[in-house]
Amino acid sequence: MKAVYKRELKSYFDSMIGYIFIAFLVAMNGIYFLYYNMLGGYPYYSYVLGAMEFIILMAIPVLTMKCLSDERRSKTDQLLLTSPVSLPKIILGKYLAMETVFAIPMAIFCLCPLIIKANGTAYLREDFASIFAFFMMGSVFIAIGMFISSLTESQIISAVGTFGIVLVIYLWPGISSMLPSFLTDNFITDLLPNYTVTGVMDSFTSYHLFDIGGLVFYISLIFLFLFFTIQSVQKRRWS
């Protein structure tokens, strides 16, 4: 798994995707940070992360689009299926490589609450909790993108498909409110407003609550989509 992780991580910076992904997130964060905190005087950095939710929807598909679709296009996916390393370890190695790339801008984001603190009142506990929640939300989107990438050999289809799915997830609270009552008056839809991907994030950024149940929900989704990815790749072994 370590060799897969190193190879995959290196590929993101050899192809410039890693640099573009990091630069885009850091630049957009800087714009929102300047607007909300430096010029607007808001003491909570979490406001910036709330505004960054849509930005991450656009960035994640760029990161995940090649992770498995490129292997399928170049026919090197057969090497994955015959590798002495188990398939779950290969998938996990690739996932952790993307997580590492994503963690770099997150580490830079951690400087922002400290800058606020140096210039006045800051709420470090709430802000760092929000950064962690933002990282976990992005990790869910990465797992989803990885699964979509396993379904196609086209990077463009992978990116567009991932963006479409995470966009629906982002808009789901509004979509569900417009559904007919006979579709929404049940146990599942009563549960969903409390545990939606963006709803959990809002608990941290808007209400400053450390939502443990929401984090468990995130972790469950990550494992679920990693499992789907393993099954998707495994299916090709027998096809």
Stretches found by the model and what they are:
Residues 11, 69, 80-82, 145, ...:
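Helix-capping/transition residues at the boundaries of transmembrane alpha-helices
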Residues 11-27, 90-99, 178-182:
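Alpha-helical transmembrane segments of integral membrane proteins, especially early/N-terminal helices
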